[in-house]
A protein has these predicted regions:
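Short, solvent-exposed beta-strand/turn "edge" segments of beta-rich domains on protein surfaces
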Residues: 40-50, 61-71, 87-91, 148-151
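Cleaved targeting-peptide boundary
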Residues: 25-36
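N-terminal secretory signal peptides that target proteins for export/translocation
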Residues: 1-6
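Bacterial N-terminal signal peptides
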Residues: 10-21
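Glycine-rich, aromatic-bearing surface loops/beta-hairpins
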Residues: 144-196
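A beta-strand/beta-hairpin structural motif
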Residues: 50-55, 106, 117-119, 127-150
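Structured domain cores in non-transmembrane regions
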Residues: 64-129
Length: 196
């Protein structure tokens, strides 16, 4: 009799652990979908190199629901400029990060995006998540590098990587998501030789 009770308790405990594990596994896939730098190029304009890029971010119902529940997402675009060396590792000349945020505003029923480092604290709002992610994935004429930072007669490489991660949380979301790790993802590096 005691053996049956212990076996039953062990079975219940195993079922509970499996349910928790399945829940964690399903949450880890929350940022599933395409995350890539689709295209990018640099255009020199009066001694300033401007970046043009298109990034595809994942979109799914889990992201939409989390934003509507008060989660903020951070979108980072890492840019690395390195001097190519023939017989040694490339030398990093400059590193920059374009930081953007996305949140859902419940009163207006709109998605609000902003550039974190913008001096004007500009915000733009969008009716749908798809529109907001398309805008966040569009970088047009972002000045990131000055000509004097580059030496003449040297070859340089520009590399981009897009990332999505969990931002600020409401108190309710902090309690629910404190143990999840599925809210951070980065794309592969997208690289090309800099033409001057």
């Amino acid at each position: 009799m005691q053996f049956r009770r212990a076996h039953h308790l062990t079975s219940l405990l195993m079922a509970a652990l499996l349910a928790i594990g399945a829940s964690v596994a399903s949450r880890a896939d929350v940022l599933d979908g395409v995350l890539e730098v689709s295209s990018a190029y640099v255009k020199p304009e009066q001694g300033v190199f401007q970046l043009f890029a298109r990034i595809t971010y994942p979109v799914n119902d889990d992201i939409r629901a989390a934003l509507k529940d008060g989660l903020m997402l951070n979108f980072d675009l890492d840019v690395v400029v390195s001097r190519e060396r023939r017989f040694w590792m490339d030398e990093t000349v400059a590193e920059y990060t374009l930081k953007r945020e996305l949140l859902y505003h419940a009163v207006s029923d709109r998605y609000v995006a902003r550039d974190v480092d913008s001096p004007n604290n500009d915000q733009r709002s969008y009716a749908t998540l798809e529109e907001a992610l398309e805008a966040l994935g569009t970088v047009d004429a972002w000045p990131f590098l000055l000509s004097p930072q580059l030496s003449a007669n040297r070859q340089y490489r520009v590399s981009l990587r897009a990332g999505v991660r969990r931002g600020r949380l409401s108190d309710t979301m902090r309690v629910l998501l404190f143990w999840t790790e599925g809210w951070h993802r980065e794309s592969e590096w997208f690289s090309w030789s800099l033409q001057r």
